[in-house]
Design a protein with these regions (language model features):
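Helix-loop junctions and terminal segments of transmembrane helices
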Residues: 61-77, 150-151, 214, 275, ...
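Signature of the first transmembrane helix
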Residues: 7-69, 135, 237-267, 393, ...
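Membrane-water interface segments that mark the loop-to-transmembrane alpha-helix transition
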Residues: 11-23, 61-113, 127-130, 303-328
């Protein structure tokens, strides 16, 4: 296989790995400050609130993925109309931002966060949560900046900007600590960090679009010199399946935290929250490659056999890398959790092992998630995600009776392996080849097209 593909796929992961000490130090310092100013018992719920954004990835309605694909295809074969697709995407996401802000404000006004999180929260805490979720809502349209950068093949820039979010969060936490803040106010820092990074990514993305305009026509960029008079909502045709995917993923992978907040003790929730934070650092190194893979596969849709070969190599590569990452979590997470919490929170080894299993499961599925991006393929993914979510919740609830938080992590790993990775092995080659035949049949409607399998033989 061409080594340039591996370089393109993993350059972002290498950059993330190089920057990992900075992000890790920022995360550890941020957690230490929050624990010191909220207390051990309150840290779990404050961290859960700060991670509410992870439960709302469907807020972009799948528009981000379609924008990445549109920009990636445009970079291979420039075509008119990119600006209309971008404006349609921004129109939809600005509407989503208004909806999130209004909904969050109403929930804070009527103190509805308390029953949702299963906690006895004060009126001021409810309002603080509403402010944080509103900031997250305003950051939703800004998320297209990273999507555009990935589509342009600048995954390295997207990764660098994503890492600044942790640094911004630490800066806001330090300011609040110096100002004498306490309690729920510290849940705002992650939302503010995300918003700040979004501003930077949006500015750079449209700067690069304008810079590359001579190769595609300056009028195609959203900030081009010619006025935009219409929207192209047809470009968002694959968003319906992406909405289901982005709802099903947090439902299967993140709901355990909410259920634990309602059924477990404060210490169990704090242990789970801290372990999830350590897991997120490890997973971010591997998941960074998904953006580059999305672009690589989108630009090679005309070569199905090559795409299938790349997918197979990536499954093996990610499987090996995730095994090392899981070993890291199993060996070091209990020690790291104790250091970060000043010995107050002890992560059980079984919890670390469960998250390690989840890391391997998600990594094995990651290449297929970036490969299957046509509307039909996304609908297949959507069905698999729903199966995954159902398995994750059912198995997690069953195991949590005896394993606590580890049961939810192990349930999620089971859901991903059975609901997503197993279908990948069975369906990916056929779906990729069928997609190529369908596109050619539309291009040559009068000809009979004979599909070939991934070894190049006629079926």
């Amino acid at each position: 296989m061409d080594r340039s593909i591996f370089r393109q796929a993993f350059s972002g992961s290498v950059l993330r790995l190089i920057g990992l000490p900075i992000v890790a130090i920022a995360g550890i310092a941020n957690t230490s400050l929050v624990v010191a100013n909220t207390g051990i018992a309150a840290y779990g719920i404050v961290n859960t609130v700060a991670m509410l954004g992870a439960l709302l990835p469907f807020s972009d309605l799948g528009v981000g993925g379609t924008v990445t694909t549109a920009v990636a295809l445009d970079s291979v074969a420039p075509r008119a109309g990119l600006k209309h697709k971008l404006k349609a995407a921004y129109f939809v996401l600005i509407a989503v931002a208004f909806f999130i802000v209004i909904t969050a404000s109403m929930m804070g006004m009527f103190a509805l966060w308390s029953p949702l999180l299963g906690q006895d929260l004060s009126v001021s805490d409810n309002r603080i949560i509403s402010v944080g979720v509103s900031v997250f809502g305003l950051a939703v349209p800004l998320g297209l900046g990273v999507r555009i950068l990935i589509g342009l093949g600048r995954n390295d820039l997207a990764v660098a900007i994503a890492m600044t979010s942790s640094i911004f969060s630490l800066a806001f936490t330090a300011v609040m600590a110096l100002a004498g803040g306490h309690g729920m106010i510290f849940s705002l820092t992650s939302f503010l960090g995300l918003f700040s990074a979004g501003l930077i990514s949006t500015f750079l993305a449209h700067h690069l679009l304008r810079k590359g305009a001579p190769t595609r026509d300056a009028s195609q960029t959203l900030l081009g010199s010619k006025p935009i008079r219409r929207y192209d909502f047809r470009a968002l045709s694959g968003s319906g399946a992406l909405i289901i995917i982005t709802i099903g993923l947090p439902l299967g992978l993140e709901t355990g935290r909410i259920l634990l907040s309602r059924t477990g003790s404060p210490m169990m929730l704090s242990q789970y929250a801290l372990m999830a934070q350590l897991y997120a650092i490890t997973w971010s190194v591997l998941s960074t490659a998904s953006g580059a893979l999305w672009t690589i596969f989108a630009q090679r849709r005309a070569d199905p056999n090559g795409s299938i070969a790349i997918w197979r190599w990536m499954v093996v590569s990610f499987g090996l890398l995730s095994a090392f990452g899981a070993a890291f979590l199993w060996a070091l997470a209990p020690w790291a959790g104790s250091v970060i919490s000043h010995g107050e929170i002890l992560i059980p080894p079984v919890l670390a092992m469960s998250f390690g299993a989840l890391l391997i499961a998600q990594s094995l599925h990651l290449p297929a998630g970036s490969l299957l991006t046509t509307p039909r393929q996304l609908w297949v993914q959507a069905v698999c995600v729903l199966v995954m979510a159902a398995l994750s919740l059912s198995v997690g609830l069953l195991l949590a009776r005896t394993m606590g938080g580890a049961g939810f992590a192990l349930g999620a790993a089971t859901g991903v392996l059975v609901g997503q990775f197993l279908p990948d092995l069975l369906l990916v080659p056929r779906l990729v080849l069928e997609g190529t035949v369908r596109r050619k049949s539309r291009k040559y409607p009068g000809q009979r097209l004979v599909p070939v399998n991934y070894r190049g033989h006629r079926e």
